[in-house]
């Protein structure tokens, strides 16, 4: 919950998340015991681990990913599960589909903390080229009180923004008198979501103050997206269609290997059954051999 509210908490222990993530995790691990993916030693060679998950779900786009290595970095935004699956089905139905047509199914990133994406050109660039700078803003409303005062209530913040750091930044700007008109800042976030309350002075102009918040704080920020991923052992930047195509190809390989595994298992079983049939047809001879042994 602390992570969902943008409080910058560390990653939760397995026991905190396993119940909610179990259905999706089972889809990611489905058929892993049927030789569907290659196995390799882990970091200390004490165990074998999958080189990649079988993954019935296109999790790279759904969950997003961020990371940095020598000479490269990736920053893939999360997407809506239903939209990504619709886009994947569209690609399967029409392998020659264009990126523009895929965008009819996948409208854009789906940031869990909410906020507003300003300008779709950056999203289009991301899907066409694999790179894009997405401008985001938090969402806020202005409430007028009978006393003549007003308050700004922030209920959504940009993705990956640490709420605590945002509050600290606003407090510092007020102290430095770069953000005037705020008399109090309260964090009323809870299970219902994010709620930051900024009490304003009578002399404050709410809309001007809100614009200054977007200008001087991370309430207005940019998500530098780059869809870099490992494809056949090599890192490369991919557009939307290429990412989905890699997933479809991967699933084809998984299903092929699963089918071969089940066929080999059935053949082994058939070999045993053939032997049993021969034994049943020659029961007297089998009994004689056993007695004489």
Predicted regions and their residues:
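Solvent-exposed "coupling" segments
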Residues: 127-140, 188
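Generic, well-ordered alpha-helical scaffold segments in large soluble proteins
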Residues: 20-31, 60, 64, 72-75, ...
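Preference for bulky hydrophobic residues occupying beta-strand positions
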Residues: 138-140, 155, 196-198
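Catalytic phosphate-handling regions of large nucleic-acid enzymes and associated NTPases
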Residues: 1-133, 195-197
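Long hydrophobic segments that form regular secondary structure
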Residues: 141-185
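Long, charged, helix-rich clamp/arm modules that form nucleic acid-engaging surfaces
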Residues: 1, 6, 10, 106, ...
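Generic alpha-helical secondary structure
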Residues: 14, 18, 81, 163-167, ...
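Short beta-alpha junctions and helix-cap segments that line functional grooves
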Residues: 55-57, 72, 122-124, 169-170, ...
């Amino acid at each position: 919950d602390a992570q969902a509210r943008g409080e910058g908490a560390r990653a939760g222990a397995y026991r905190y998340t396993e119940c909610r993530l179990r259905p999706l995790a089972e889809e990611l691990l489905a058929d892993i015991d049927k030789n569907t993916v290659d196995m390799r030693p882990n970091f200390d060679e004490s165990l074998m681990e999958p080189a990649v998950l079988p993954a019935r779900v296109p999790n790279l786009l759904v969950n997003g990913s961020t990371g940095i290595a020598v000479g490269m970095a990736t920053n893939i935004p999360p997407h809506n599960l239903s939209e990504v699956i619709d886009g994947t089905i569209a690609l399967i139905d029409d392998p020659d589909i264009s990126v523009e047509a895929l965008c009819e199914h996948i409208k854009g990133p789906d940031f869990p903390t909410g906020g507003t994406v300003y300008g779709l050109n950056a999203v289009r660039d991301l899907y066409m080229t694999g790179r894009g700078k997405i401008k985001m803003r938090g969402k806020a409303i202005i409430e007028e009180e009978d006393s003549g005062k007003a308050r700004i209530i922030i209920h959504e913040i940009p993705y990956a923004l640490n709420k605590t750091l945002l509050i600290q930044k606003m407090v510092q700007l007020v102290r430095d008198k770069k953000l005037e008109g705020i008399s109090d800042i309260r964090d009323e976030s809870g299970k219902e979501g994010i709620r930051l309350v900024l009490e304003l002075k009578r002399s404050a102009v709410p809309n001007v103050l809100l614009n200054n918040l977007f200008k001087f704080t991370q309430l207005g920020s940019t998500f530098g997206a780059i869809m870099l991923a490992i494809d056949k052992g090599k890192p490369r930047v991919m557009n939307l269609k290429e990412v989905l195509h890699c997933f479809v190809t991967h699933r084809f390989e998984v299903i092929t290997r699963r089918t071969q595994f089940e066929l080999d298992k059935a053949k082994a079983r058939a070999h045993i059954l053939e032997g049993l049939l021969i034994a049943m047809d020659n029961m007297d001879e089998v009994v004689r051999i056993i007695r004489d042994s």
